[in-house]
Amino acid sequence: GHYYADGKFVRYADLTTVTEYCHDDLETVCHTIRNKLIAGVDKRLDADAPLGFLLSGGLDSSLVCAISALVLGKKIRTFAIGMDKDAIDLKYAREVADYIGAEHTEVLMTRQEVLDTLEEVISLLGTYDITTIRASMGMYLCCKAIHEKTDIRVLMTGEISDELFGYKYTDFAPSPEAFQQEAKKRVDELYMYDVLRADRCISANSLEARVPFGDLDFVKYVMSIDPAMKVNTYDMG
């Protein structure tokens, strides 16, 4: 983002331009990532309103939930959504919730609910990007249920991790530099895709989003890691 001062636009922070990679070894990198993520989660746990957690069962949201449960030292309230038939993702979210001892809520959506909400979601997103729309349907309906049926008003999410660490976007990148350029592009364009989805779906339901993986200190460090350490060398997607 930018702000206007002294007759010109000033960029708030350039998180993706790296002039020199850090020289930390793998053990140090892993240790630093862990500590910075914990710090990023911790600083976002202070809330005047009741706090909830979106839990998909994937690595990103699971880490945020697990760290939060440890830091707070009490049960956290997690929420997952899936179709009313064959909702495989709910299984993994339930396993994580059980493991960390969370107070877990499952929101089931029907095919008709998705169809009935489609036009509304497209309108609030302001985009016809198919992937963004598809990924937004569940989040919107989950946030709607949270707002209508609970007192939760602040939500922690696992967004931005995929763009930082590669996910499928950088699988089989031809070189470390190609990995870095793709990661830079993905982070620079966050406002057009994943962050757009989370921001619109959450705020449209009068909820506040908090994104620990977007912590400035965390992002700056991850982007400075030698991309050779992040390239997929396991020949698996």
Task: Label every PLM stretch briefly.
Residues 17-237:
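ATP-dependent adenylate-handling active sites, centered on carboxylate activation for C-N bond formation
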Residues 1-27:
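N-terminal segments that mediate ammonia production and transfer
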